[in-house]
Amino acid sequence: MLSSFAQKVKAFIAENQLLQPESTYLLALSGGCDSVALLRIMIELNYHVAAVHCNFQLRNAESKRDEMFCEGLCWSLKVPFHRVYFDTKAYASLHHVSIEMAARELRYDYFEKLRKDISADDILVAHHQDDNIETVLLNLIRGTGIQGLLGMKPKNGHIIRPLLSVSRKEIEQYLSSIHQDYVTDSSNLVADVMRNKIRLEVIPLLKTLNPSVSDN
């Protein structure tokens, strides 16, 4: 019997016609709470996935820890595992972009290349409700207009977001219920970039005014 979390994700996938049972998907696996939950739920729902982990070489021993965790998790679950190393700082300097933008460009370019190499149909990423509200607020602050206020799409080209209907709290509860651990990226806990400031300071304030803000 499927868990209530699995049922909710399954319904969202069906409602938006995101996945097909006969297809193969490339799943972006950082080792964090969200992507680990995505991997476990895709297995629970019997989808065919291969995982890819990006080591951006930005956090020294922590980056290696994350990589080894992902490798071990995929080995235990019998999921094909791919990894890639990036010189993120050099790329950022060469292209005159922020570290965050460099990491984004590097990973999505590589995801598409690997998707073609392994003949995967689409790429799965673990964005959820909380990420979506962060994106809307970030776009509002940047003044991106009406289009930016629409937030993330469940599917955009070859990028699919099966977890957009669930919150970070629901994800944490799901992993706890199946006794699945994960790693924590310490850089996400510091309010030194705009998205982190929104996550750590703005959204908690909004939730004091409306506890269901991420559901809207």
Predicted regions and their residues:
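Core alpha/beta nucleotide-donor-binding catalytic domains of modification enzymes
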Residues: 1-203
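An accessory alpha-helical subdomain
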Residues: 206-216
